């Protein structure tokens, strides 16, 4: 009896668990990070699209198209040109403990890869390229239920409220003396916090951890009214009012919104009259705000980032605002500041979304619903395009949907990696044996040449027979069959002789 492929029951390992099949349709809340860099070629700032045309002209290997003019890097991040800057973006990373550090690691891994490709471009074109840090964007999912958004809990009101809450702590962790503001943008299904690029991976991870902890906590407040700040004792500078963001909808805590420039003032001077009636320093305001949200920050933070946040807030570690000027590392990102494997995989494994996207970019096939599917592209941030190998039918799956097949995908990838390792070991063993055979043949030839040279000396007419040394001429090696016959045991020879007679 022949059963068609469409009637075959999927293997148990390929079927989604029952709990996953009943999961809510909105998907997991996630974060994502972006960084923008000005491009300096031969000490002149240029538009990258005018010089390179496309990221494909920088990266030497094949790239997976994401959307528009952006392409995925082998690291899982994306690169594209945006209004005169090079922008790097991380994949979606589900919100869980260590998500801020994972996002920072992904961003800096992509930055290191891009820097290596630019180094190769420099050698090919004999020109110099520098990346100057411009800004960093921290994106956090907004997932308030739709029936509650009508109760003044909209993403726009949340962004306005967060501009007041995040200003002081983000300034202390991420800004420098040449910064101009901290912004918050409502982006539909997410909140985007914008700040200057931080040329220190540890400080960036600490900033991401603080932002995601505060945003997720404020998102759960019953009201997004500014009166909540006074009720919870969160200090705000008197008279502070954010301005509208210049590029998109949103608000910015710009230096002109304060009585003095907070980016150039002494962070330890109690010079700010606050809504609580006290005069506090910038560090004190940031510390009190951080303590108010410490439970949420601690829940989502990794140990290293939590220690650094506490150290900066208490003054045990310096803020970039305390330096006399902006660090030189801003002017050559990827060289003067690098990723030094701050969060190794053994301590902080990849997130599930990272693993899904990594398999898709690598083109590793996965078995779903009884058929093999091969990824052929990516749509936007959250969808992968597959082609069913049996009939070529295309199928678009979200990252959340692919979580149900991630374990089977991992097993397939691990099995193929193991097979490749075994094949590599076999190839190396074959190469070793071939090299040993070549050396043995070469040594035999050298011995034969030396013997022939000695024979030539014996036959030299200038030497007499009495003076010539006695040298036995080498006998020709018997054929392999004869040599094998001679080396065979007597019992085998006698047995073979009886059969031949």
Per-range role (PLM):
Residues 2-123, 132-134, 167-182, 186-191, ...:
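Terminal catalytic/cofactor-binding subdomain
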Residues 43, 143-146:
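Short regulatory "switch" loops immediately downstream of catalytic or recognition motifs
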Residues 124-125, 145-151, 222-225:
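Inter-helical turn/loop segments and adjacent helix faces that build the functional surface
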Residues 128-144:
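Histidine-centered divalent-metal-coordination microenvironment in nucleic-acid enzymes
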Residues 151-172:
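Acidic, His- and aromatic-enriched active-site or binding-groove loops in soluble protein domains
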């Amino acid at each position: 009896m022949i059963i068609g492929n469409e009637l075959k029951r999927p293997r148990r390992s390929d079927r989604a668990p029952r709990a996953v099949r009943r999961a809510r349709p909105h998907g997991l809340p996630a974060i994502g990070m972006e960084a923008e860099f000005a491009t300096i070629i031969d000490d002149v700032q240029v538009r990258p699209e005018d010089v390179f045309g496309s990221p494909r002209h920088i990266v030497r290997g094949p790239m997976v198209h994401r959307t528009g003019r952006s392409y995925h890097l082998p690291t899982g991040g994306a690169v594209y040109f945006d209004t005169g800057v090079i922008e790097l973006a991380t994949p979606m990373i589900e919100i869980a403990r260590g998500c801020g550090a994972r996002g920072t690691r992904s961003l800096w891994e992509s930055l290191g890869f891009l820097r290596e490709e630019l180094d190769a471009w420099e050698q090919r074109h004999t020109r110099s390229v520098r990346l100057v840090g411009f800004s960093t964007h921290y994106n956090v999912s907004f997932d308030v239920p739709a029936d509650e958004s009508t109760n003044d809990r909209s993403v726009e009101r949340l962004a306005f409220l967060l501009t007041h809450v995040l200003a002081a702590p983000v300034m202390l962790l991420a800004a420098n003396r040449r910064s101009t503001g901290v912004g918050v943008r409502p982006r539909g299904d997410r909140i985007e916090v914008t700040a200057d690029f931080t040329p220190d991976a540890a400080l960036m991870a600490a900033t991401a951890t603080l932002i995601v902890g505060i945003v997720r906590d404020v998102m759960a407040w019953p009201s997004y009214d500014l009166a909540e700040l006074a009720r919870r004792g969160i200090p705000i500078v008197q008279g502070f009012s954010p301005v509208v963001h210049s590029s998109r909808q949103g608000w910015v805590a710009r230096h002109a919104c304060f009585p003095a420039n907070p980016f150039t003032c002494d962070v330890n001077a109690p010079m700010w009259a606050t809504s609580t009636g006290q005069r506090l320093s910038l560090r004190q305001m940031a510390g009190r705000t951080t303590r108010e949200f410490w439970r949420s920050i601690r829940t989502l933070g990794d140990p290293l980032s939590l220690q650094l946040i506490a150290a900066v807030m208490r003054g045990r570690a310096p803020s970039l605002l305390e330096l006399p000027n902006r660090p030189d590392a801003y002017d050559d990102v990827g060289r003067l500041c690098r990723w030094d494997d701050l969060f190794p995989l053994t301590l902080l494994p990849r997130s599930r979304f990272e693993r899904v996207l990594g398999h898709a970019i690598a083109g590793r096939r996965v078995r779903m619903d009884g058929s093999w599917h091969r990824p052929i592209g990516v749509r936007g941030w959250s969808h992968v395009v597959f082609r069913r190998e049996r009939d070529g039918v295309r199928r678009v799956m979200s990252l959340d949907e692919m979580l149900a097949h991630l374990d089977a995908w991992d097993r397939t990838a691990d099995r193929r990696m193991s097979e490749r390792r075994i094949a590599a070991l076999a190839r190396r063993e074959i190469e070793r044996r071939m090299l040993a055979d070549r050396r043995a043949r070469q040594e035999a030839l050298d011995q034969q040449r030396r013997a022939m040279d000695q024979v030539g000396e014996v036959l030299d007419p200038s030497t007499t027979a009495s003076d010539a040394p006695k040298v036995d001429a080498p006998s020709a090696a018997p054929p392999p069959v004869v040599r094998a016959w001679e080396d065979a045991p007597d019992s085998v020879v006698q047995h073979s002789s009886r059969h031949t007679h």
